[in-house]
Swiss-Prot record:
Keywords: Methylation, Ribonucleoprotein, Ribosomal protein, RNA-binding, rRNA-binding. One of its GO terms (molecular function) is structural constituent of ribosome. Part of the 50S ribosomal subunit. Forms a cluster with proteins L14 and L19. It holds the Pfam family Ribosomal_L3. This is Large ribosomal subunit protein uL3. The modification N5-methylglutamine is found at residue 150. The gene is rplC. Belongs to the universal ribosomal protein uL3 family. Methylated by PrmB. The keyword Protease does not apply. The keyword Ribonucleoprotein applies.
Length: 211
């Protein structure tokens, strides 16, 4: 099953195994994912399920969105996400929660990384710094040459330079689900995941573990 869920990052903690081994985990709150639309090959050309999660004030919902949510008979959510579906059937109004995952399962977690603002090449691209002494002056953290001379007479696209860092879509693959708390809708995943506390996360079964 390739379907995933949208969750919210609660932060990190650690849990202990029966042998006393400490495992760092990220706590992800899986709020009920309400199905807003089920797409089929006959009507849409592919199979997918569209879900919404959370809440949004009525004043922030457009007329088109309000009609879409009303047709599915679900409350307006803060975001809408679509998952391709290989098997299974869903109807508008159904709910998907953390119970679709099991302890020991591998998952891919996608989120927006923390924004770092404008950063230089050392922090952004792990460039090495130049000599601190030996005649170097004011050039300790400069990137160095960014191209050739008259030929080609330009800087190539994709050149690693200073610029905005972070605030981009990042996926961490094959993280282990340590524990599933269905009563509190919590998913405990081994290791760190992208983004700040409170940010949206998309949790899917690991692509490299599906065979």
């Amino acid at each position: 099953m390739t379907i995933g869920v949208v969750g919210r990052k609660c932060g990190m903690t650690r849990i202990f195994t029966e042998e006393g081994v400490s495992i760092p985990v990220t706590v992800i709150e899986i709020e009920p994912n309400r199905v807003t639309q089920f797409k089929t090959e006959e009507t849409d050309g592919y199979r997918a399920v569209q879900v919404t999660v959370g809440e949004r004030r009525a004043s922030r919902v457009t007329a088109a969105q309000a009609g879409h949510f009303a047709k599915a008979n679900v409350a307006a959510g803060r975001t809408v996400m679509e998952f391709r579906l290989e098997e299974g059937e869903y109807q508008a109004g159904d709910q998907i929660n953390a119970e679709i995952f099991a302890a020991g399962q591998l998952v891919d977690v996608t989120g927006q990384s923390k924004g770092k603002g404008f950063q230089g090449t050392i922090k952004r691209w792990n460039f090495r710094g130049q000599d601190n002494t030996h005649g170097n002056s004011v050039s300790h953290r400069v990137p160095g040459s960014i191209g050739q001379c008259q030929t080609p007479g330009r800087v190539f696209k994709g050149k690693k330079m200073s610029g905005h860092m972070g605030a981009e879509r990042v996926t961490v693959q094959s993280l282990e689900v340590v524990r599933v708390d269905a009563e509190r809708n919590l998913l405990l995943v081994k290791g760190a995941v992208p983004g700040a506390t409170g940010g949206n996360l998309v949790v899917r079964p690991a692509a490299k573990a599906r065979g």
